[in-house]
Regions:
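Glycine-rich (often Gly-Gly/Gly-Pro-rich) flexible segments and glycine-rich loop motifs
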Residues: 1-59
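Helix-rich, typically C-terminal accessory recognition domains appended to large enzymatic cores
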Residues: 71-215
């Protein structure tokens, strides 16, 4: 944290060759007001300092006009994307800046999961040619076991953002594989299910999984 006790303000330090910090909150937890910043040459700084303000958080409220309608997010991005983004933003009890770009990024991840299993060029919904009933090779098995262990541990510790990050790594790895074992995909969907239940359930069914993936 940047040490700004003299001004009663804290933020995350950014080392980019000069003095810069992301000023988010005052020490008492209240928002940083506009009169505590100043404009210089197109940039915003903490008044009287060389600390550059790269982001400033405001609580959502109707009076500020910055309320996000969850129904609109679900309509445009899907319920899984909204759920996953809220979990990916960090500790649930922490105050976090809302970003629609972030929601879009999470939706892109879910789309990659879909393309990892489904043939996106087919006229109907069918498994892609890479899905096989062969066993995992050594690298695939290691990646699968590491992912199961990491996601399980992080989920139990409620470190949801790092669990999601590990699932992203899994998806990137297996997307590059010419063969994607069906059982590895099903194991991954079990991990994904608490985070993106609708997508996980649909893909589980398409892979021939028995019953409900959440059970």
């Amino acid at each position: 944290k940047a040490d700004l006790d003299a001004k009663g303000i804290w933020g995350d330090r950014v080392d980019d060759g000069d003095k810069a910090s992301v000023i988010l909150k005052q020490a008492d937890g209240s928002d940083l007001s506009d009169d505590e910043t100043e404009k210089r040459k197109g940039n915003t700084f903490l008044a009287g300092t060389d600390f550059k303000v790269l982001a400033k958080a405001d609580k959502m409220s109707k009076s500020r006009g910055n309320v996000v309608n969850p129904d609109a997010v679900v309509r445009d991005y899907g319920a899984d994307a909204l759920r996953l983004y809220e979990m990916f933003m960090g500790p649930l009890e922490a105050t976090k800046p809302w970003s629609m770009d972030g929601v879009g990024g999470v939706r892109n991840f879910l789309d990659r999961v879909w393309r990892m299993i489904i043939d996106q060029d087919a006229d109907e919904i069918v498994l892609c040619d890479a899905i096989t009933d062969d066993a995992c090779d050594e690298d695939q098995l290691r990646t699968l076991h590491q992912t199961i262990r990491k996601v399980t541990e992080d989920t139990e510790a409620m470190s949801f953002n790092t669990a999601i990050a590990r699932m992203m790594e899994f998806t990137n790895f297996f997307t590059r594989c010419e063969k994607r074992p069906r059982e590895a995909m099903k194991s991954f969907l079990i991990l994904l299910s608490p985070y993106a239940p609708h997508l996980a359930e649909e893909l589980w069914m398409l892979l021939g999984g028995e019953g409900c993936v959440a059970k």
